[in-house]
Amino acid sequence: MGQFPEGVDQELARGDAAFTAGNEGMARVCARRAIGLLIDGLWTPASHAAPWPRDTLHKLRRIHEDEAFPIEVRQAAQRLTTKVTQQDTMPFPTDPLADARLVIRHLMNDTA
């Protein structure tokens, strides 16, 4: 897949630890941070003339809305931006680290 920009591996590791400890909220934060760091440090798609937003949630929303991305990548980005309900539950089953790795894998392959 290639080498990640600085901080991506650390955020994924923190997210894995949080998820294992049952802290899905922190795992989601780490998953999103990892994607943001990757985009900031590496990925500049030739197919996108507009610059990437600075905010990671906006980056994920852009991926979700962009039909140039495969549907599974777009759905993973959507899950990572979906708000947790007041009862701390998601409207669908989720593994934020698996979603992050799916998006990261696609972005890394797109730059190869």
Language-model regions, residue ranges each:
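Long, charged low-complexity segments
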Residues: 43-112
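Charged alpha-helical initiation segments
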Residues: 1-23
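Short, conserved alpha-helical segments within structured domains
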Residues: 30-31, 96
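Solenoid-repeat scaffolds in large eukaryotic assemblies
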Residues: 27-28, 34
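Charged, low-complexity interaction regions
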Residues: 22-25, 88-90
